[in-house]
Amino acid sequence: IDTVTVGKQPSGMSINRAGNLALIANRADNSISVLSIQGKQVKLVDTVAMGEHVAHVAFTPDGKRALAGKFPGHKVALLEVDGSKVTYAKRDLAVGLWPYNLDVTPDGRLALTADNGNNGGSDGNVDTVSVIDLEANPPRVIDKVVVGDAPEGFAISPTGRLAVAVLLRGSNNSKTEWFYNRNGSVVVLKIDGKKVTKVGEVEVRGLPEGAVFSPDGRWLYVGNFMDEDISVLRVDGDTVTNTGTLVKLPGKPASMRGRTQ
């Protein structure tokens, strides 16, 4: 119904829980676009300079803060939100290498980042998920959890009990590379208070990038870019299993959107 012009190479987007403000991370522009939402009207109201490439952005549940992943800087920027005014006071947190995706728990206590590693691609070496304590003053990184090679897609369940990091595992690399795998995988992380622990790993298909939970948290859907389909996984407590069901798509799924922040 309309087109809104933002910055160059828009890479990540987040809409606040109230549904009246959206932020877009513009990778090639080193900026974040601020959009107001009123009914079906969406307008660009501001652009915030970030100084470096930003790959993704996420609101906290109360809408008073947002976090932006500074992809090549290996940092997460903290932004303050007051109405439609978004301010960046150059407060950054050092996380793992090449943070690409990030999410905030539904209770707003933690933020987790998928640290993609190796300039945003597989190299056979393990990478991490960084754990940020948002209740601390000031917020800080309290842990880094080793997950595997090249976590890109990332999601936290609606209950806040689980998170998943989607590993590329060299599935988009040449078959001659020593770290090549035909399929990627999903690493399951248990969230217990402020402790995050790897509890499982499930193989999916080629170059998995996006992941979303169903609203009730009982299902997980993973988009497989190379195979042009979606893997359907069942969630039972802390256990995630691949049902083997595939939903064929007419194109390559590069990202997916799930629960409201």
Model-found features: residue ranges?
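Predominantly soluble domains enriched in secretory-pathway, periplasmic, or organellar proteins
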Residues: 1-261
